[in-house]
């Protein structure tokens, strides 16, 4: 990683947003005559929208920010974030939006960490770097029966990044069990083949209020 004062030759910043989902240079703020005339998009029930897309170059997704008009448990679990790297037909990330940002019980609360944050519990920020060699696509699927009226977001990434042989792809996996089975292990991570790094996990537990309200 270069120091802040060192020139990054051949690396260019891109910013995908509601008005410029492909992150093209000079293509944002076009809907309102040079102003932010399309600050949000709507996601209809049972539909999928592409939030960011890049082809024909290497790069690194460096930051994602989102906030929604509907922060209900149903919407946070029903919106599904999907990330595809290098043309793969299977998403490397395929998780409910709320769980991806560590809001696993459907409640939004303030969160501050080096990888994820939710300032004041009103928005979601993701700082984990997600590299790609040839292409990337980030989709959001609404699996609920309700329309999401407003989704505000931006995706910051760079293109032209030199990526060595030791580059790792970012993956995220989701598992939900209701109810858990006594004396049966809950699977946190399925069997993984190959090498990688385990960055961490978020677990949300809703206890049996009648039996364990004084324990949890």
Language-model features, listed with the residues they occupy:
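Beta-strand-centric surfaces of beta-sandwich/beta-rich domains
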Residues: 1-216
């Amino acid at each position: 990683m270069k120091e802040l004062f060192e020139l990054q030759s051949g690396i260019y910043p891109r910013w995908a947003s509601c008005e410029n989902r492909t992150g093209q240079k000079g293509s944002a703020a076009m809907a309102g005559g040079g102003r932010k005339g399309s600050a949000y998009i709507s996601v209809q029930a049972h539909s999928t929208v592409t939030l960011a897309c890049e082809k024909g170059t290497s790069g690194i997704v460096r930051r994602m920010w989102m906030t929604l008009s509907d922060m209900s448990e149903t919407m946070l679990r029903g919106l599904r974030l999907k990330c595809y790297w290098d043309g793969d037909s299977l998403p490397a990330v395929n998780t409910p939006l709320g769980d991806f940002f560590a809001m696993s019980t459907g409640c939004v609360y303030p969160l501050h960490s080096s990888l994820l944050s939710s300032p004041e519990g009103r928005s979601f920020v993701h700082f984990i770097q997600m590299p790609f060699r040839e292409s990337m696509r980030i989709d959001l699927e609404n699996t609920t029966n309700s329309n999401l009226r407003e989704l505000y977001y931006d995706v910051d990434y760079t293109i032209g990044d030199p990526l060595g042989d030791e580059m790792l792809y970012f993956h995220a996996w989701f598992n939900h069990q209701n109810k858990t089975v006594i004396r049966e292990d809950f699977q946190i991570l399925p069997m993984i083949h190959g090498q990688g790094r385990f960055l961490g996990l978020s677990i949300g537990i809703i206890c049996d209020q009648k039996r364990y309200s004084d324990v949890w």
